[in-house]
Amino acid sequence: MQSQAKAVTAYLKEVPAERKAALKKLRQLCRAALTGFEETMEYGGPSYKRNGVVEVGFASQKNFIGLYILRTDVMNAHRDLLKVRGVSFGKGAIRYSKPERIDFNVVESMLRATHESTGEVC
C-alpha cells in the first residue's frame, strides 16, 4: 500500500489492524538498531536513511509485509536464516505472507549488521 502519510506515526494509523503490532515492532527495532539514521517516509512507507541514502524500509503491501534491507552484504549474510515457509525474498526485499512469519531476532540481526555495514546499497 503506497501511503500518502507524511510521518511514520500517521502511516501506522492507516495499516490493517492485523498487521499493526508487527509493523510497530519493526519500527521499534529500526529505531533502536539504526542510531544515527533519519526516519522518513519514502516510496510510500517508513524508511531509514544514512547520509541521504535509504538503507532500510518496511511497508504493508496488499499481500504481504515487506522489509527492505538494501545493503547487499547484509542480505547475503542472512539468506539462510530467511529460508522459511511463508517468507520469500529477492535482492533487497523480504516478503512476509503473514505477520507471525516475521522472526524478529533475525530482523534485529539484519538491522544491527546494516548499522555496521559499509557495503554496497542495492
What spans do the regions from the language model cover?
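Charge-dense, helix-prone N-terminal extensions
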Residues: 1-122
